[in-house]
Amino acid sequence: MDKLIITGGNRLDGEIRISGAKNSALPILAATLLADTPVTVCNLPHLHDITTMIELFGRMGVQPIIDEKLNVEVDASSIKTLVAPYELVKTMRASILVLGPMLARFGEAEVALPGGCAIGSRPVDLHIRGLEAMGAQIEVEGGYIKAKAPAGGLRGGHFFFDTVSVTGTENLMMAAALANGRTVLQNAAREPEVVDLANCLNAMGANVQGAGSDTIVIEGVKRLGGARYDVLPDRIETGTYLVAAAATGGRVKLKDTDPTILEAVLQKLEEAGAHISTGSNWIELDMKGNRPKAVNVRTAPYPAFPTDMQAQFISMNAVAEGTGAVIETVFENRFMHVYEMNRMGAQILVEGNTAIVTGVPKLKGAPVMATDLRASASLVIAGLVAEGDTLIDRIYHIDRGYECIEEKLQLLGAKIRRVPG
């Protein structure tokens, strides 16, 4: 397994471009299964999860065409099997997103129960109950979700989400696009990635209204056609590099991003002492060489502070002036990185769903192990602000969510390199 070696102590300084959002790209790729003519998806990040989704299509008989810019053209009319097998689904939770489109377009689907990050119990029952509300017959047996649409196809329905679910909202929105009649999703996720999927569906000929609010109304249509669509920028990658710059007292300019979908994070960085300026597609952060001030953070669904940025802020707080509390309300079991950071000299106390971080002037490099995607990003930031060398093991977690992380950090002046396992 590859490892990252980071020699800390350098302030980040420079410009990089932000990749397309994985959490937008995966549902949009799944949505291409709904169309009866080819769909081209652009601005895809070069990530393992994207490769896995493309491989999953290949297993199903759909052979995407990939150009030199990694734009992917999908023609789902060649589909041969409606099974998403366990050996692929187990590596990536987002495979569940093919369930709604396959069921709506082809009338049946068989999808293995998903794997993915080891954070908390992320149930798929909302997906199942929502599709049942649209008339689907679903059984879970042998580790597979086996779904059949009624004769004549899925029917529009009303569904209320007991808890806000991003992938649940996306799956039902895609299924409803080809259902008969109107579907109303209440307590729907409001994330920018949900809005991006709705925009893509509408570009394909769907009628989706209200995405970005907690009530989404979908009028089913008879068919969806081809489109060319650009995936939105990755707000979590953007936030991660901003926090890395803030923690090191540096200055960065991030291009091809969108400041309007990151307001909660930018506000907290300003509170930490960062000078931030923005344009329509760029963000600049300058700490002017200063140490950050500790901030309090409480995660919640969008538009509040994102759970996927919590670990990075713990790293910044670890070397900040003062004490900051980070409260995690979205997932349980999401402080696994804290114990690794304490081995580097951080002073972090976990009490239930709260991490209390007392800043220290410097962390010390140490061998550490990544446990999930965002936790691994926090260890990279910790390595950047530590004295000496930090060796991060199990970086396949990082590669699931960050495109060329060591190359981008090198462009910003970090001493970081990948060593083959």
Swiss-Prot record:
<protein>
    <recommendedName>
        <fullName>UDP-N-acetylglucosamine 1-carboxyvinyltransferase</fullName>
        <ecNumber>2.5.1.7</ecNumber>
    </recommendedName>
</protein>
<dbReference type="InterPro" id="IPR013792">
    <property type="entry name" value="RNA3'P_cycl/enolpyr_Trfase_a/b"/>
</dbReference>
<keyword id="KW-0808">Transferase</keyword>
<keyword id="KW-0963">Cytoplasm</keyword>
<comment type="similarity">
    <text>Belongs to the EPSP synthase family. MurA subfamily.</text>
</comment>
<feature type="modified residue" description="2-(S-cysteinyl)pyruvic acid O-phosphothioketal">
    <location>
        <position position="117"/>
    </location>
</feature>
<feature type="binding site">
    <location>
        <position position="93"/>
    </location>
    <ligand>
        <name>UDP-N-acetyl-alpha-D-glucosamine</name>
    </ligand>
</feature>
<feature type="binding site">
    <location>
        <begin position="122"/>
        <end position="126"/>
    </location>
    <ligand>
        <name>UDP-N-acetyl-alpha-D-glucosamine</name>
    </ligand>
</feature>
<feature type="binding site">
    <location>
        <begin position="165"/>
        <end position="167"/>
    </location>
    <ligand>
        <name>UDP-N-acetyl-alpha-D-glucosamine</name>
    </ligand>
</feature>
<dbReference type="GO" id="GO:0051301">
    <property type="term" value="P:cell division"/>
</dbReference>
<keyword id="KW-0133">Cell shape</keyword>
<dbReference type="InterPro" id="IPR001986">
    <property type="entry name" value="Enolpyruvate_Tfrase_dom"/>
</dbReference>
<dbReference type="GO" id="GO:0071555">
    <property type="term" value="P:cell wall organization"/>
</dbReference>
<dbReference type="GO" id="GO:0019277">
    <property type="term" value="P:UDP-N-acetylgalactosamine biosynthetic process"/>
</dbReference>
<dbReference type="InterPro" id="IPR036968">
    <property type="entry name" value="Enolpyruvate_Tfrase_sf"/>
</dbReference>
<dbReference type="GO" id="GO:0008760">
    <property type="term" value="F:UDP-N-acetylglucosamine 1-carboxyvinyltransferase activity"/>
</dbReference>
<feature type="binding site">
    <location>
        <position position="330"/>
    </location>
    <ligand>
        <name>UDP-N-acetyl-alpha-D-glucosamine</name>
    </ligand>
</feature>
<comment type="function">
    <text>Cell wall formation. Adds enolpyruvyl to UDP-N-acetylglucosamine.</text>
</comment>
<dbReference type="GO" id="GO:0005737">
    <property type="term" value="C:cytoplasm"/>
</dbReference>
<feature type="active site" description="Proton donor">
    <location>
        <position position="117"/>
    </location>
</feature>
<keyword id="KW-0132">Cell division</keyword>
<dbReference type="GO" id="GO:0008360">
    <property type="term" value="P:regulation of cell shape"/>
</dbReference>
<feature type="binding site">
    <location>
        <begin position="22"/>
        <end position="23"/>
    </location>
    <ligand>
        <name>phosphoenolpyruvate</name>
    </ligand>
</feature>
<dbReference type="Pfam" id="PF00275">
    <property type="entry name" value="EPSP_synthase"/>
</dbReference>
<dbReference type="GO" id="GO:0009252">
    <property type="term" value="P:peptidoglycan biosynthetic process"/>
</dbReference>
<comment type="pathway">
    <text>Cell wall biogenesis; peptidoglycan biosynthesis.</text>
</comment>
<keyword id="KW-0573">Peptidoglycan synthesis</keyword>
<feature type="binding site">
    <location>
        <position position="308"/>
    </location>
    <ligand>
        <name>UDP-N-acetyl-alpha-D-glucosamine</name>
    </ligand>
</feature>
<keyword id="KW-0670">Pyruvate</keyword>
<dbReference type="InterPro" id="IPR050068">
    <property type="entry name" value="MurA_subfamily"/>
</dbReference>
<dbReference type="InterPro" id="IPR005750">
    <property type="entry name" value="UDP_GlcNAc_COvinyl_MurA"/>
</dbReference>
<keyword id="KW-0961">Cell wall biogenesis/degradation</keyword>
<keyword id="KW-0131">Cell cycle</keyword>
